[in-house]
C-alpha cells in the first residue's frame, strides 16, 4: 500500500454529548459512533442520538453500534437516527447485517479467547461476511462488550484481508502512533481512550489522539 496517498481514518465511539460531537468535527474526525447495545454504559436512546446528530459536521459519518439487538431495534435506529454506517459486535450473521440496506462493519473479538477460541482467519471472516464494508478488530472477548480500555496482541491480526479494517481496543494517545506503524489499519476506533468517564469525552485527550494519528501518518510517508 502506498502510504504517501493514504491517511488513517479516525472514529470516536460512545458519544453521549453534542459538545463532544462538535469538537470531533472541528478536529477532523471521520466518524462518530452511537452505541445501542444493551448493557453498555455508553448506550443512548434513538431519540437522544437523533438530537445529537444535529451537531455532526458535514462529511462526518454517523455510525450505529449494536450487539445482538433485535431486527426491530435496529430498524428503529435506522429510521430515527439515519446513520450512514452500521456496526455489529455480536453473533449477527451476514444476512442479518445487510438486511437494513446500509453498509456495515463487523467487529471481530480478539480477547483472550480469540474468535471462537482461535485466532481470526482472513479467509473464514471474508467467507462468513462477504458483504461487509470492513472489519473492526477489538480487544473484547466473544459475547462481551467493547470499551474495556485493554489492548490485544496486534501480531494476531489476520493477514490477507481484502477489506479495510479498523483497529480498536485500548487505543489512546500514548499508543496509537505505535499501533498504526505496527498494523497499518484503514482506521482506528477509540472510546475509553479519549474519556474522563464512560461516554464523557475529554477535549484534551481527543485533540492529542488526533495529533498522534496524524504524526503516525507523516511518519509512514517519510
Swiss-Prot record:
Belongs to the TrpF family. It catalyses: N-(5-phospho-beta-D-ribosyl)anthranilate = 1-(2-carboxyphenylamino)-1-deoxy-D-ribulose 5-phosphate. Pathway: Amino-acid biosynthesis; L-tryptophan biosynthesis; L-tryptophan from chorismate: step 3/5. GO terms for biological process: L-tryptophan biosynthetic process. This is N-(5'-phosphoribosyl)anthranilate isomerase. Its EC number is 5.3.1.24. PANTHER family: N-(5'-PHOSPHORIBOSYL)ANTHRANILATE ISOMERASE.
Amino acid at each position: 500500500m502506498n502510504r504517501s496517498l493514504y491517511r488513517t481514518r479516525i472514529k470516536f465511539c460512545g458519544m453521549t454529548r453534542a459538545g463532544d460531537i462538535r469538537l470531533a468535527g472541528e478536529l477532523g474526525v471521520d466518524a462518530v459512533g452511537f452505541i445501542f447495545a444493551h448493557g453498555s454504559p455508553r448506550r443512548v436512546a434513538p431519540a437522544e442520538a437523533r438530537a445529537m446528530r444535529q451537531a455532526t459536521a458535514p462529511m462526518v459519518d454517523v455510525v450505529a453500534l449494536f450487539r445482538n439487538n433485535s431486527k426491530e431495534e435496529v430498524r428503529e435506529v435506522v429510521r430515527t437516527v439515519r446513520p450512514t454506517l452500521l456496526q455489529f459486535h455480536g453473533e449477527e450473521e451476514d444476512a442479518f447485517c445487510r438486511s437494513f440496506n446500509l453498509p456495515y462493519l463487523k467487529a471481530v473479538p480478539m480477547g483472550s479467547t480469540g474468535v471462537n477460541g482461535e485466532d481470526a482467519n482472513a479467509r473464514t471472516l471474508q467467507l462468513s461476511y462477504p458483504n461487509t464494508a470492513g472489519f473492526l478488530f477489538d480487544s473484547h472477548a466473544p459475547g462481551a462488550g467493547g470499551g474495556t480500555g485493554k489492548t490485544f496482541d496486534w501480531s494476531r491480526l489476520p493477514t490477507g484481508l481484502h477489506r479495510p479494517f479498523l483497529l480498536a481496543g485500548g487505543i489512546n494517545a500514548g499508543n496509537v502512533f505505535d499501533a498504526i506503524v505496527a498494523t497499518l489499519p484503514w482506521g482506528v476506533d477509540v472510546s475509553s481512550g479519549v474519556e474522563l468517564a464512560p461516554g464523557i469525552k475529554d477535549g484534551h485527550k481527543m485533540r492529542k489522539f488526533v495529533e498522534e494519528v496524524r504524526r503516525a501518518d507523516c511518519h509512514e510517508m517519510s
